[in-house]
A protein has these predicted regions:
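Short, surface-exposed beta-strand-loop junctions and turns on beta-sheet-rich folds
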Residues: 48-52, 70-71, 127-128
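Short beta-strand segments
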Residues: 12-48, 64-66
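Structural motif
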Residues: 39-41, 61, 117-119
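Charged, amphipathic alpha-helical segments
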Residues: 1-3, 49-52, 94-96
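Short, basic/aromatic recognition patches
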Residues: 1-14
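Active-site-adjacent structural patch at catalytic or cofactor/ligand-binding sites
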Residues: 46-48, 58-68, 77-83
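Charged, gly/pro-rich active-site loop segments
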Residues: 73-130
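A generic structural signal for nonpolar/aromatic side chains embedded in well-ordered alpha-helices
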Residues: 9, 55-56, 96
Length: 130
C-alpha cells in the first residue's frame, strides 16, 4: 500500500462501514478505528448483537469509507476500501486498546477489516496538476 494512503488512514479515527442488508439493500455504521499497517487492517470495537456485526458475519465482504471532514475543496481527502470482516487477532486488540484505552471499560468485541483494495483521493494532488 502506498505510504500516502497509510499516512492518511493513521491520521483519521472514524470510518463508515457498509454491508448488505437482509433485503438486499445497504446498511451503514460509523466506527472508531485503529490501523494495523503491518497487516493492512482496520480494527474497531462493537457488540456482537448489533445489526452491522450480524450483517457482516452473514456477508463478510464489506465496504469502508474514510474521509477528512473539510469544507475547503483542495483539502478534500479520502479512501474507499473493499475489506473482509473477521474477528481481530490478539495483536490487533492490543493496537486498538493502545489508541483507545478507555474502550477496555466496555464489554465490546474487537473486529478487523482486512483491506483487499483501496482507492485514495487527495484533491491537493489532483488540483495541483490542473
Amino acid at each position: 500500500m502506498d505510504e500516502r494512503i497509510k499516512k492518511f488512514i493513521h491520521s483519521q479515527k472514524l470510518l463508515n462501514l457498509s454491508m448488505l442488508d437482509e433485503d438486499g439493500g445497504v446498511y451503514c455504521a460509523s466506527c472508531y478505528y485503529a490501523f494495523d499497517d503491518k497487516n493492512l487492517a482496520l480494527i474497531f470495537a462493537s457488540e456482537e448483537h448489533t445489526k452491522h456485526i450480524q450483517l457482516a458475519y452473514k456477508s463478510p465482504k464489506v465496504a469502508v469509507n474514510i474521509a477528512l471532514d473539510t469544507d475547503v475543496i483542495n483539502l478534500i481527502k479520502g479512501v474507499q476500501i473493499k475489506a473482509l470482516f473477521q474477528k481481530a487477532t490478539k495483536e490487533q486488540e492490543r493496537i486498538y486498546y493502545k489508541k483507545f484505552p478507555f474502550a477496555k471499560l466496555a464489554q465490546a468485541c474487537i473486529f478487523a477489516l482486512n483491506i483487499q483494495w483501496a482507492k485514495y483521493t487527495d484533491n491537493k494532488i489532483l488540483l495541483s496538476k490542473k
